[in-house]
């Protein structure tokens, strides 16, 4: 039997998603909890591996098991063995054709940026921060150059294991709410560090360091050294993974973050 889980986690508490020998990753914590509840080792496959500091609101995993449990039993039983920084939100039996990674056709990330002369300790690990004003319109104009199917080598980490740098970026939204700017990135898939590298470039344009059309030149150059430095991970959230309707994957529970009302206005896909 194949079981899918919806998982949320505080990325600041972990060294990324992927299991490591030191055991301080989200995958390590989840698989330990599943093993405790099931009394047998269980291996998970994830929709998208997030880096250290990146949060998960709509992360999806699957695993195979012969155990017969109710859906909510998997939720409550696994959560009983998880730290407070990770939570299984739902569980659902799936057909063998479902695959958390390969069945997904799109991913959506949000970035929350706090723009204020002084950093807030209440937002540590929850939002990025910059002390200088930003030009929202300039960032929107720059983002427009990135929409479509392109070779995103200029925004790819040297450690990226993707077979191709070509991805289809469907949408970038920039929405201001008080001292916060909310960015939404939606694509069929993302390269390693791609969103954070895009953020670094958008912020550089917003600060007036480059004109909006500079980003078109960076994209065309297909050279990582042309782009701005990788932006901090603190405000990055994996919010949604899209699957074909036949799998009826439950929607991510975004109400757990204080800025969910702003995100709702951005019309998160279901």
Curated annotation (Swiss-Prot):
NCBIfam families: hisT_truA. It comes from Burkholderia ambifaria (strain ATCC BAA-244 / DSM 16087 / CCUG 44356 / LMG 19182 / AMMD). Gene3D superfamilies: Pseudouridine synthase I, catalytic domain, C-terminal subdomain (3.30.70.660), Pseudouridine synthase I, catalytic domain, N-terminal subdomain (3.30.70.580). Homodimer. InterPro entries: PsdUridine_synth_cat_dom_sf, PsdUridine_synth_TruA, PsdUridine_synth_TruA_a/b_dom, PsdUridine_synth_TruA_C, TruA/RsuA/RluB/E/F_N. GO terms for molecular function: RNA binding; tRNA pseudouridine(38-40) synthase activity. Pfam families: PseudoU_synth_1. Belongs to the tRNA pseudouridine synthase TruA family. One of its GO terms (biological process) is tRNA pseudouridine synthesis. This is tRNA pseudouridine synthase A. The gene is truA. The active site is at residue 51. It catalyses: uridine(38/39/40) in tRNA = pseudouridine(38/39/40) in tRNA. Substrate binds at residue 109. The lineage of its organism: Bacteria, Pseudomonadati, Pseudomonadota, Betaproteobacteria, Burkholderiales. HAMAP family: TruA (MF_00171). Keywords: Isomerase, tRNA processing. CDD domains: PseudoU_synth_EcTruA. Formation of pseudouridine at positions 38, 39 and 40 in the anticodon stem and loop of transfer RNAs. Its EC number is 5.4.99.12. The keyword 4Fe-4S does not apply.
């Amino acid at each position: 039997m194949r079981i899918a889980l919806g998982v949320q986690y505080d990325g600041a508490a972990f060294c990324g998603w992927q299991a490591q020998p030191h055991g301080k990753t989200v995958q390590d914590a989840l698989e330990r909890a599943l093993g405790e509840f099931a009394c047998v080792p269980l291996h998970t496959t994830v929709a998208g591996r997030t880096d250290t500091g990146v949060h998960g609101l709509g992360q999806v995993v699957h695993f195979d098991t012969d155990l017969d449990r109710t859906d909510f039993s998997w939720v409550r039983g696994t959560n009983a063995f998880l730290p407070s920084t990770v939570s299984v939100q739902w569980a659902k039996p799936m057909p063998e054709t479902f695959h958390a990674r390969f069945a997904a056709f799109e991913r959506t990330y949000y970035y929350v940026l706090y723009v204020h002369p002084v950093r807030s300790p209440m937002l540590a690990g929850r939002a990025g921060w910059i002390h200088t004003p930003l030009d929202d319109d300039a960032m929107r104009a720059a983002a427009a150059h990135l929409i479509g199917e392109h070779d995103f080598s200029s925004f790819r980490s040297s450690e990226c294991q993707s077979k191709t740098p070509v991805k289809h970026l469907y949408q970038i939204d920039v929405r201001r709410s008080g001292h916060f700017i909310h960015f939404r990135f939606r694509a069929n898939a993302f390269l390693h560090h791609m969103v954070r590298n895009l953020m670094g470039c958008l912020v550089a344009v917003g600060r007036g360091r480059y004109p909006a059309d500079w980003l078109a030149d960076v994209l065309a150059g297909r050279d990582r050294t042309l782009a701005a430095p990788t932006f901090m991970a603190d405000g990055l959230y994996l919010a949604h993974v899209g699957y074909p309707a036949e799998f009826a994957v439950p929607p991510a529970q975004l109400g757990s973050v204080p800025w969910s009302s702003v995100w709702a206005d951005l019309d998160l896909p279901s």
